[in-house]
Amino acid sequence: QIVRMIPTLKVNNRRLNELFYIETLGMKPLLEESAFLSLGDQSGIEKMVLEESPSMRSRKVEGTKKLARLIVKVENPSEIEALLARMDKIPQLYKGTKGYAFEVLSPEGDLVLIHAEDDIKDLKKVDETVTFSKDEKLQYLTAFDISVEINLPEETTSLLEKEEIENGLAFKQAQGSDLLVDNNVTWD
């Protein structure tokens, strides 16, 4: 049985990605060790790891990435508004029963959805301009959970049982030559 899943993202430029995940998404740096950066929330529990892999060892993904989307579910919806207030340019907004959500691309081109809903199907796209109030007290998110959507090559299924992964992983069929390469080959 899988007890806890901690996504590890391979990145080319850790510093650029570190700034994005900390300043834009409000994740707290927990431990920095050589090529690894552990990120979490105020609880101090590790939720995600960034692993720097320089271009002499890995390369950019050609075509579709294995990571379809990183989904961050925030416990306190008002913290999402505080994150949005810090941004110079507001990304794609959504609204749900608990509040706002947004989708943004990381420096590596990974799609990240930040929300507080029980079900992301409740989110509706917001097209009008919205202004958010700054919250100087918020430095890092109080509590959040991460799940991932993974692209699998067409005609492929996961070896994991649905009960094992609960809501932590979702699989989508996709096409792309790099969906079948080893983990150490690309930044994905």
Feature annotation, model-predicted:
Residues Q1, V61-K65, L138-A143:
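Short, flexible turn/loop "capping" segments at secondary-structure junctions
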Residues D88-E149, E161-D188:
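Vicinal oxygen chelate
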Residues T8-K47, E51-S53, I150-D182:
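Core segments of cupin and vicinal oxygen chelate
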Residues N13-R14, E75-E79, E108, E154-E155:
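Helix N-cap motif at beta-to-alpha junctions
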Residues R4-P7, M27, M48, L67-A68, ...:
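Short, structured motif recognition centered on aromatic/hydrophobic residues
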Residues I71-V72, V148-I150:
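Short, well-ordered beta-strand elements within core beta-sheets of diverse protein domains
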Residues L50-S78:
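A broadly used, surface-exposed interaction patch
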Residues L19-F20, S78-A85, F102:
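Short amphipathic alpha-helices within nucleic acid-binding modules
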